[in-house]
From Swiss-Prot:
Heterodimer of HisH and HisF. It comes from Actinobacillus pleuropneumoniae serotype 7 (strain AP76). IGPS catalyzes the conversion of PRFAR and glutamine to IGP, AICAR and glutamate. The HisF subunit catalyzes the cyclization activity that produces IGP and AICAR from PRFAR using the ammonia provided by the HisH subunit. This is Imidazole glycerol phosphate synthase subunit HisF. It is found in: Cytoplasm. InterPro entries: Aldolase_TIM, His_biosynth, HisF, IGPS_HisA/HisF, RibuloseP-bd_barrel. The active site is at residues 11, 130. One of its GO terms (biological process) is L-histidine biosynthetic process.
Length: 257
């Protein structure tokens, strides 16, 4: 059985790490490189960097910090933000990224997933999905351009359909960003994760809602996700990664320590 992964997420805007609540009202957390180094030293299994306004601004990831991060950490890291072409991805891999993640550009052109998977291998291609639960209808919708609240739009894709579509096209991993839960720290949406897990045959990473150690345990044991991604609880030292891993190990979760 593969060890479960603990993944700090760093949302990047204008060269700094920021964090919002439900993808809005972002506050500055600090500089990218020292934070990345800290997480690697504290025992993170992997890091994810989202250049959150790249897609909505119509540009690709600001590459200047990617190379600097690669120089100071020795764990895998994934980069996302406005990657629309093979060339965009090639540059990020050349600077040291281990994986790239696409989200809004995949919705704009689903063939991009296949092109990237064919060129770099499925193991290097992650698809991020921003889901929104519509209480009135009980449906989960996929949103696009969520890095800019003025441009965020609901697509015509329902969540489970899109999860199946991206797998057919070559996604090697899915990060599910559950927008209703984002930054509110009251737990991952286990109902949603279980629904996605039933149709997801590639590694599934939960994102949005972690506030306590038990939330990580529940995502792993109840929804059988492969990794749990979190931001504010790590940025604000509400949870220390080393302590979290000891707790999960004691709770019977297969984890790298």
């Amino acid at each position: 059985m593969l060890a479960k992964r603990i993944i700090p997420c760093l949302d990047v805007r204008d060269g700094q790490v920021v964090k919002g609540v439900q993808f809005r009202n972002h506050e500055i957390i600090g500089d990218i490189v020292p934070l990345a180094k800290r997480y690697a030293e504290e025992g993170a299994d992997e890091l994810v960097f989202y250049d959150i306004t790249a897609s909505s601004d119509g540009r690709t990831v600001d590459k200047s910090w990617v190379e600097r991060v690669a120089q100071v950490i020795d764990i895998p890291f994934c980069v996302a933000g406005g990657i629309k072409t093979i060339e965009d991805a090639e540059k990020l891999f050349a600077f040291g990224a281990d994986k790239i993640s696409i989200n809004s550009p995949a919705l704009a052109d689903p063939n991009l997933i296949t092109a990237l998977a064919d060129r770099f291998g499925v193991q290097a291609v992650v698809v991020g999905i921003d889901s929104w639960f519509e209480k009135e209808t009980g449906k989960y919708w996929v949103n696009q351009y969520t890095g800019d609240e003025k441009r965020t739009r609901q697509t015509n894709w329902q969540l489970l359909d899109w999860v199946q579509e991206v797998q057919k096209r070559g996604a090697g991993e899915i990060v599910l960003n559950m927008m209703n839960q984002d930054g509110v720290r009251n737990g991952y949406d286990l109902t949603q994760l279980k629904l996605v897990r039933e149709v997801c045959n590639v590694p599934l990473i939960a994102s949005g809602g972690a506030g306590e150690m038990v939330h990580f345990r529940d995502a792993f044991t109840q929804a059988n996700v492969d990794g749990a991604l979190a931001a504010s609880v790590f940025h604000k030292r509400i949870i220390e990664i080393g302590e979290l891993k000891e707790y999960l190990y004691a709770e019977g979760v297969e984890i790298r320590r």
